[in-house]
Amino acid sequence: MKLSFITQAISSNSDQSSSIFKFNSISALSLIAAACILTPTAHADDKVVAGYFADWQYLNKDYPYTVDDIPADKLSHIIYAFLSMCGPHSGAGEPVQKQIKQQCADKEPYTAIIVDKEAALEVDFGDVNVDVAYKGHFAQLAQLKADNQNIKILPSFGGWTMSEPFHAMAKDPKAIAHFSKTAVELIQKYDFFDGIDLDWEYPGGGGLTTSPWNPDTKLTDEQKALEREAFTLLVKTIRSDLDALSKTTQRDYELSTAVGVGAKAAQIDWNAASPYLTNMFAMTYDFLGGWGTQTGHTTNLHATERSWWGMGADVFINQMIEQGIPNEKLVIGAAFYGRGWQGTKDFAGELPKGDLVSEQGAQFGTGENGYFMFWDLMNNYSSKQGYEYKYDEQAQAPYLWNPDKKVFISFEDQRSIKAKAEWAKKSDLGGIFTWELSGDPS
């Protein structure tokens, strides 16, 4: 994509709120736009433009995504999703549980592990010039690092389906120490990594195996307090081990964490934890989804009087700052996907209100019901298929509406991401990141 076209897209004042559904490439426009808005160069030290890389997306039959597809020259950080540790993973699918069992056969509990070793180390994605004893994504990342010295590459531990062992580990300081030690040893072995990212969903509960709505999984106040202290101990311990590694390698290492919004963020003692962290990635998406009938924007920048429960990225970000996260370390999240519903009631395509509901989440999507990758929306949900493109300027949020099928899809596009980047700059945030890069492979 030519830079002149990018510049034109950034500065364009054309009306994008019409029902004519015209997508531009998010990764080609918006992340570059974010880099242009937030910082004069893609790899400036002061601002983050990051993307999560999902290690399983190379298997996508429609749009396989590999390291070679990453726009490395436009990013400051690549975050590899996901690694884990030996421990309970009851929420993970059977194939993942099998992988973890294999990797942990000869390891102590809470040892840091590569879950999908085939993808990371064995699949042949092509020749590399770097001298490494492995293939897979890791070889490609080692080459990418050699070609882009200023970029930061971090492995992320946890994720929605693999956060259960964090809760078990939190009960034992020795387990925390062991995980930290082995995680740091892992990045020392695969030395293209520049630190560690944590995606514990969530300290204090609210994740897949700690739902507050289920009396069998809801954490007690005592357990929440323990995990609050454990998270601080965890980041303090990892920071200490990374600093020790720095003395050996003469390199600086980053430590970051993903942050849930609302009550989930409030469960962490940020005044105690944030000094040990380089960046905190605010998951300002999935405000709503097909798991409920409430319908509306899922990743809107601004809360409005029409927002369900007053939700908006700006509200959540400001809450995090009030809770002790330094604004310059806080990175706002953007989604390369959408969430959808069907049977939307009493709606004709106007701006969604805070009482909008549907019969259920969409019973179709990209690989899972109600979830739509951006490339899928771009290719299969246009005006040709009866979808009208709408834009809520007050919320800075696009959405699709199919009046015949009564389908509502909330998503992110270049306009809304540009708005987030501009707001992040105005608010002196640390930057912007996306989950996840393969959503727009163009």
Task: Give the positions of each predicted feature.
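Glycan-recognition patch characteristic of GH18 chitinases/ENGases
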Residues: D45-I187, W213-N214
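An active-site-proximal structural segment forming one wall of the substrate-binding cleft
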Residues: K171-D197, L234-D241, A265-Y276
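Extracellular low-complexity, Gly/Ser/Thr-rich intrinsically disordered linkers
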Residues: Y58, L377-S442
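Substrate-binding surface in catalytic domains of secreted glycosidases
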Residues: N60, S90, E94-E122, G204-F372
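A cross-domain feature marking catalytic cores of carbohydrate-active enzymes
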Residues: F53-D55, F82, P155-G159, W200-Y202, ...
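Conserved, mostly hydrophobic/aromatic
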Residues: I78, P155, L198, I238, ...
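Short, well-ordered coil/turn segments that N-cap beta-strands
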Residues: K47, L75-S76, Q149-I153, F192-D194, ...
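Gram-negative bacterial Sec-dependent N-terminal signal peptides
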Residues: M1-H43
